[in-house]
């Protein structure tokens, strides 16, 4: 749509869903900006563009959203670009700033949030028998990815090696997984195949781990299907236990 503030239909989305505080905040920010800054500031793709300007990257700047998997998707795109020979290095960044009162209310209505507000050690305990939900969080993180050859050539301190990537979509429900866990099972198997690894080579799984009965049940089903009886002795947790859910 046009950028001008006198665009006749500028309130159409706002009027269609007045319960969404996001549109109200967007309008408030837009009113405070100079007219020429509105498009650049609110355009989704400008996030990657500004990072490219800041750090001088020359690869394709991509801004994406795959909800909770956005950071992992950014890493996968970087890995695949390096594999294709499009670049030696890739900057993959994940960021989230969606902790609002409305988000807290909606997740609370789903009984998805931990109520251990006064005892943080008991909050957000993925797969624990006494878990009661996750802690909503905000934050960002960045990884510099590069080919192993490039890293060794410059004497880099290598923190980890990405052996494989994989993903699948679950079209069953917005917040619930398919009952047979087939998309999650396929995703794990896709990663193993891409990495050229067997199930027996995996020693730890960092799961989605929302500390909710629905998530824990489906992740256990998918992992036990892929790894069999080994899942009983294999460490499984989630970084949500330390930094919350972004």
Task: State the predicted function of each range.
Residues 42-46, 69-73, 85, 102, ...:
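Conserved active-site and cofactor/substrate-binding residues in soluble primary-metabolism enzymes
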Residues 3-77, 86, 109-135, 222-246:
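Conserved catalytic cysteine-centered active-site region
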Residues 86-132, 165-179, 207-217, 233-246:
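Acyl-CoA/ACP chain-elongation machinery
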Residues 1-2, 6, 13-14, 187-199:
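Conserved active-site "lid/cap" helical segment
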Residues 118-197, 203-204:
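Condensing-enzyme catalytic core mediating Claisen C-C bond formation in acyl metabolism
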Residues 51, 71, 78, 107, ...:
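Conserved small-residue
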Residues 1, 65, 90-96, 137, ...:
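Short beta-strand segments
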Residues 56, 83, 152, 193-196, ...:
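Residue-level signal for alpha-helix termini/capping positions
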